[in-house]
Amino acid sequence: MSTSAVARNKTLDMVYIALFAVLIAVCSWISIPTTVPFTLQTFGVFVTVGVLGGKRGSFAVFIYLLLGAIGVPVFAGFTGGMGILLGNTGGYIIGFLASALLMWLVEKLLGRKTWVLALSMVFGLIVCYAIGTAWFMIAYAQNTGSIGLATALGWCVIPFIIPDIVKIVLALVVSNRVSKLMKLNLN
């Protein structure tokens, strides 16, 4: 591959990563405020990794987190800053990166097939729930008082299971269609 082709591919990678970091931000702004805000962030993360693949998708999620950490209002409710990441629901936001990295690992181990992507999205969601709920319990205990696991799951996980399953199905459909339209070399 020529030097100009390599430079072009790197430039395209950077553009796609930036665009999909913005997609995640836009999805986070579509929000219904609850104890843990209902947003389309998980949808955005899953579409990002589904279209760009694990490596590029993980970079896009990292860029999204980095922008939010330095104060750019990319999180739910047009918020940003370390206070959000360290707050009660920050673990779910950090869990997005863990989800993307896990999806990348599953992709590396099992290849890029639709059923593998679906499986990795489910595993990614479980990891996000686990990190976010553990973080929520610790942050809530420091800020308000102790909270039991059953209560935390009732507030932070159970109400989101069905909507998140719907988001996974939609993310699979969108990822497959967008990947075909973009004709990306995802390997």
Predicted regions and their residues:
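Hydrophobic transmembrane alpha-helices
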Residues: 1-60, 70
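Short helix-perturbing small/polar motifs within transmembrane alpha-helices
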Residues: 1-4, 19, 26, 82-130
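Membrane-helix interfacial "entry" motifs
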Residues: 5, 9, 13, 34, ...
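Hydrophobic alpha-helical transmembrane segments
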Residues: 14-19, 43, 47, 58-63, ...
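Alpha-helical membrane-inserting segments
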Residues: 23, 27, 31, 48, ...
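Interfacial aromatic-anchored transmembrane helix boundaries in multi-pass membrane proteins
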Residues: 28-40, 65-99
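Pore-lining transmembrane helices
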Residues: 41-43, 56-57, 64-65, 158, ...
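Membrane-embedded alpha-helical hairpins and interfacial helices in multi-pass inner-membrane proteins
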Residues: 112-187
